[in-house]
């Protein structure tokens, strides 16, 4: 059973969040949490919490429908980052000018699902 979690208006630029999201796409959910726990990027912690939230949602749905729940069999089926609204600020510059500062936000969505039995893992070749 698929489970979904999303965070909105996260104060991390989408470009930096996508670097973190690419680390865990397609991995086992428990492995993804371990990778994100030690990733140095600032976006790693919110993404880790989001994956944990999706797993908690999966456990809730499994309990609700009286199904067995094994966290080891869940994988990050889909994860993507969308751009949220941008806050515009101004910084004073020389000779009365103003420089524009863009404070970007992100919307991140995670979908976890049980791994398909018998599916082979594909490796990308260079």
UniProtKB/Swiss-Prot annotation:
Choose any GO biological process term that the UniProt entry carries and state it.
Answer: translation
Please verify whether the record's keywords include Aminoacyl-tRNA synthetase. Answer: no
Entry-linked PROSITE patterns: RIBOSOMAL_L22
Q: Which UniProt keywords apply?
A: Ribonucleoprotein, Ribosomal protein, RNA-binding, rRNA-binding
* Gene Ontology MF: a single term: structural constituent of ribosome
| Family classification | Belongs to the universal ribosomal protein uL22 family.
Name the UniProt record assigns to this protein: Large ribosomal subunit protein uL22
Gene name, per UniProt, is rplV
């Amino acid at each position: 059973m698929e489970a979904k979690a999303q965070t909105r208006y996260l104060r991390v630029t989408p470009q930096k969040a996508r670097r973190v999201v690419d680390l865990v796409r397609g991995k086992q959910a428990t492995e993804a949490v371990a990778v994100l726990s030690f990733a140095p990027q600032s976006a790693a912690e919110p993404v880790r919490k989001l994956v944990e939230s999706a797993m908690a949602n999966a456990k809730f749905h499994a309990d609700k429908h009286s199904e067995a729940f094994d966290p080891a069999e869940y994988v990050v089926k889909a994860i993507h980052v969308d751009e949220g609204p941008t806050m515009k600020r101004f910084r004073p510059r020389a000779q009365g000018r103003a420089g524009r500062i863009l404070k970007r936000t992100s919307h991140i969505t995670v979908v976890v699902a049980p791994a398909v039995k018998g599916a082979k893992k594909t490796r990308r070749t260079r």
